[in-house]
């Protein structure tokens, strides 16, 4: 049984949560996020806490219970504090720059790689570190993965785009015969 679903989500000041049928609407200022549960879990707000109740006793309902609780918690954290991912660029001549709403990457190709920055996401570049900030955890992770995919780190010299906390397992190069 899910132990994650049992935990109530405390709603911080500044973030407002309302239940509209099977939807939970979270708002903070002009930002609004909606989580649709499709009636799979019971919803209740009491004492500044959001409580999700088990929808049924089958295994599927128990899985949904923990999943929707985690998704709702990510929305609350995203609206109150936000999420950040950092990428590092390693390689001679590899650069990144933000030009308007486009991230321009020079990754050793014959052409620059342009990545359109979606609304609600901030991307900052400082030397060889790309910082991605936003309120949607899934979107931030997806953007970081898409940028990394342009030039994943290679195992011989470590050149490419990698997550800042990622370790690259290096391989030894060819050895000469004597």
Swiss-Prot record:
| UniProt GO MF annotations | rRNA binding; structural constituent of ribosome
Show the InterPro entries listed in the entry: Ribosomal_uL6-like, Ribosomal_uL6-like_a/b-dom_sf, Ribosomal_uL6_a/b-dom, Ribosomal_uL6_bac-type, Ribosomal_uL6_CS
Transmembrane region positions?
Answer: none
Q: Which PANTHER family match?
A: 60S/50S RIBOSOMAL PROTEIN L6/L9, LARGE RIBOSOMAL SUBUNIT PROTEIN UL6M
Ranges in coiled-coil conformation: none
Q: List the disulfide bonds.
A: none
Q: Which GO terms describe its cellular component?
A: cytosolic large ribosomal subunit
Q: Which UniProt keywords apply?
A: Ribonucleoprotein, Ribosomal protein, RNA-binding, rRNA-binding
What is this protein's name?
A: Large ribosomal subunit protein uL6
Functional summary from the UniProt entry: This protein binds to the 23S rRNA, and is important in its secondary structure. It is located near the subunit interface in the base of the L7/L12 stalk, and near the tRNA binding site of the peptidyltransferase center.
Native species: Wolinella succinogenes (strain ATCC 29543 / DSM 1740 / CCUG 13145 / JCM 31913 / LMG 7466 / NCTC 11488 / FDC 602W) (Vibrio succinogenes)
Underlying gene: rplF
Q: Which family does it belong to?
A: Belongs to the universal ribosomal protein uL6 family.
Domain of life, per UniProt, equals Bacteria
